[in-house]
Curated annotation (Swiss-Prot):
One of its GO terms (biological process) is 'de novo' UMP biosynthetic process. GO terms for molecular function: allantoinase activity; dihydroorotase activity; zinc ion binding. Belongs to the metallo-dependent hydrolases superfamily. DHOase family. Class I DHOase subfamily. This is Dihydroorotase. Binds 2 Zn(2+) ions per subunit. The keyword 4Fe-4S does not apply. It holds the Pfam family Amidohydro_1. It comes from Ruminiclostridium cellulolyticum (strain ATCC 35319 / DSM 5812 / JCM 6584 / H10) (Clostridium cellulolyticum). GO terms for cellular component: cytoplasm. Zn(2+) 1 binds at residues 60, 62, 152, 305. Zn(2+) 2 binds at residues 152, 179, 232. Its cofactor is Zn(2+). Its EC number is 3.5.2.3. InterPro entries: Amidohydro-rel, DHOase, DHOase/Allantoinase_Hydrolase, Dihydroorotase_CS, Metal-dep_hydrolase_composite, Metal_Hydrolase.
Length: 428
């Protein structure tokens, strides 16, 4: 199969390519990048006036498969991801059964091959059963195909266990993704502790509950010389802690999510359960710090933390509603609208944070447009506005606080291995 993308503004952060040109993919591989490529025998996409970049890579999502398929499964989750411009996703292990052994890791890999619309990479559980008591067989998980380790959804509260995990992970050259949360400080808090929680009469989850654990993990990473990735950073001090650790030479990368640079805890007004996430939405001061961290490189990656929940888990009182929101289909447009359009990031910097950097952190061979590499690409109009409509989401779940929002940059084409899976915004 030959696919020719003509006259698109091709942007690639690794090669420095930033011009209008053509891309020819043959049998899924990028064969040529240049002008006036022969169209004979090709399926042609006219990308005039559009940007062509490497496909997005999500380093943090929840596909809920196995065990929670009523919320999402590998088919519906990857359909949703493809619609949002993702060509590769790494899924967290908090499934049922947990992804804490070779069989479960291979289950995800094999099911993704038959049911998935894009590349799926499982993240293995750091501890057995996500209980934080005993390390999983890290070597077994790595050799089975896990691309990282995490107990995401719960913190590793035992500092000794985390220290050992870092030492073993270093031996197997695999990164730990840390969900930083001190449950004693959370103390059953439901949203950010502050003015809004007081107004709503809801128990608060203080910023130090996140920051204390970020500090602990940075200290342990510095001591063990391990590589650590801090998930879903949401606070000003959290950004400062990571910035200072990087200056000291700690091998740390960090991510945030679109809701942490677009929303504050004001979104919880009216007891809006679609704005209930973990870590919670913070204050405008924290949002500003997250944006600054993205600008100065402290925060390397934008992930979705796509967390689908059935309507029955959200359409309840705030106290018992599930944490999380869906993110695949709004992440890139939110980043374009709130980061690129205001001038906080260039489009090239955004591609770094949503494609190249997550690929590097996970050790994937993705995030670039080079001859000989798989043709994982997206095509989009930076200036076309659209309105978010949750009824059009491909995800089984619709728990998003962004319904009705006007955004820019919705992907028009998503191409995985040289094959279009989304064409003119329609999933094929």
């Amino acid at each position: 199969m030959k696919l020719l993308i003509k006259n698109g503004h091709v942007l690639d952060v690794k090669t420095g390519l930033d011009r209008v040109t053509d891309i020819l993919a043959v049998d899924g591989i990028i064969h040529e990048v240049g002008s006036k490529i022969d169209e004979a025998g090709c399926e042609v996409i006219d990308a005039t006036g559009l940007y062509v970049t490497p496909g997005l890579v999500d380093a943090h999502c929840h596909l809920r498969d196995p065990g929670y398929e009523y919320k999402e499964d590998i088919e519906s989750g990857t359909r949703s991801a493809a619609k949002g411009g993702f060509t590769s996703v790494a899924c967290m292990p908090n499934t049922n059964p947990v992804l804490d052994n070779e069989a479960m890791v291979k289950y995800v890999i094999n099911k993704a091959k038959t049911d998935g619309f894009l590349n799926v990479f499982p993240i293995g559980a750091l501890s057995k059963g996500l209980k934080g008591e005993e390390l999983s067989e890290i070597g077994e998980l790595k050799f089975a195909g896990a691309v990282a380790l995490s107990d995401d959804g719960r913190p590793v509260g035992n500092s000794s266990l985390m220290k050992k995990a870092m030492q073993y992970a270093s031996m197997f050259d695999i990164t730990i993704i840390s969900h930083c949360e001190d449950l004693d400080l959370v103390d059953e808090g439901l949203m950010n502790e502050g003015y809004q929680s007081s107004i709503l009469g809801l128990k608060g989850n203080p910023a130090p509950a996140e920051e204390v654990m970020i500090a602990r993990d940075l200290i342990l990473a510095e001591y063990t010389k391990a590589t650590i990735h801090i998930a879903h950073v949401s606070t000003e001090l959290g950004v400062d802690l990571i910035r200072n650790a990087k200056r000291r030479g700690v091998k740390v990368t960090a991510e945030t999510c679109p809701h942490y640079f677009t929303l504050t805890d004001n979104a919880c007004e009216g007891f809006n359960t679609n704005a209930k996430v973990n870590p919670p939405l913070r204050t405008q001061k924290d949002v500003d710090a997250i944006i600054q961290g993205l600008k100065d490189g402290t925060i390397d990656i934008i992930s979705t933390d796509h967390a689908p929940h059935h309507i029955d888990e959200k359409n309840v009182e705030f106290k018992i509603a599930a944490n999380g929101m869906v993110g695949f289909e709004t992440a890139f447009p939110l980043a374009v609208t709130y980061l690129v359009k205001p001038g906080h990031l260039s489009l090239k910097e955004l591609v770094y944070k949503m494609s190249f950097n997550p690929s590097q952190m996970l050790g994937l061979n993705k995030g670039t447009i080079e001859v000989g590499k798989l043709a994982d690409l997206i095509i989009f109009d930076l200036n076309e506005e659209y309105k978010v409509n949750i009824t059009e989401f491909e995800s089984k779940s619709k728990n998003s606080p962004f319904n009705g929002l006007l955004l820019y940059g919705q992907p028009q084409y998503t191409i995985v291995g040289g094959t279009p899976v989304v064409r003119k915004k329609v999933l094929l």
